Amino acid sequence: MRVAVIAVGRLKQGPERELADRYFERFDEAGRKLGFRELSIHEIPESRARDAATRMAEEAAAIGAYIPDKSILVALDERGQNLDSTVFARHLGRWRDEGAGHTIFVIGGADGLSPELRRKAKLAIAFGSATWPHQMVRVMLLEQLYRAATILAGHPYHRA
């Protein structure tokens, strides 16, 4: 199963980028052994439209270009479910075992994701009830992907 992260906004050089790169590499290595192929990250430019609805619509259109048909879409949204790491890992493992070709995680911009994208998502998840900068959400998502791979592999990284 291919896993992709589509994020509105760029992750600039600095500590967040270094941490994201570290978890990207760790998941890529651990995930290959578990049937997860080709983790990819696509950065979508932030819309410069004046109103939020137009910005979200433009960003949703750009995001949609990276979503293959029959993909499992997971929205990162503050209104989403708070999943513990083990449940998150079970979702990922189940989708892989059911033969999903692609699982796509989508991180919105400053205004969040369009209602249309949220409706299309098979699952919406949140990292707590707080609102997080998209840079931090990307790092946390990549860490959770790596953690999920270690849980599925029975590796001791996750010690809950």
Swiss-Prot record:
UniProt name for this protein: Ribosomal RNA large subunit methyltransferase H
Similarity comment text for this entry: Belongs to the RNA methyltransferase RlmH family.
Assembly and oligomerization: Homodimer.
PANTHER family reported in the protein's UniProt record: METHYLTRANSFERASE (PTHR33603), RIBOSOMAL RNA LARGE SUBUNIT METHYLTRANSFERASE H (PTHR33603:SF1)
EC number per UniProt: 2.1.1.177
Function noted in UniProt: Specifically methylates the pseudouridine at position 1915 (m3Psi1915) in 23S rRNA.
Keywords associated with the record: Cytoplasm, Methyltransferase, rRNA processing, S-adenosyl-L-methionine, Transferase
Protein's UniProt keywords contain Cytoplasm: yes
InterPro entries in UniProt: Alpha/beta_knot_MTases, RlmH-like, tRNA_m1G_MTases_N
Alphabetical list of Gene3D superfamilies matching this protein: 3.40.1280.10
Keyword Zinc in annotation: no
Residues given in the record as S-adenosyl-L-methionine binding sites: 76, 108
Subcellular localization(s) per the UniProt record: Cytoplasm
Swiss-Prot/TrEMBL catalytic activity: pseudouridine(1915) in 23S rRNA + S-adenosyl-L-methionine = N(3)-methylpseudouridine(1915) in 23S rRNA + S-adenosyl-L-homocysteine + H(+)
Entry's Gene Ontology molecular function annotations: rRNA (pseudouridine-N3-)-methyltransferase activity
Any Gene Ontology CC annotation: cytoplasm
Pfam families: SPOUT_MTase
NCBIfam families: PRK00103.2-3, PRK00103.2-5
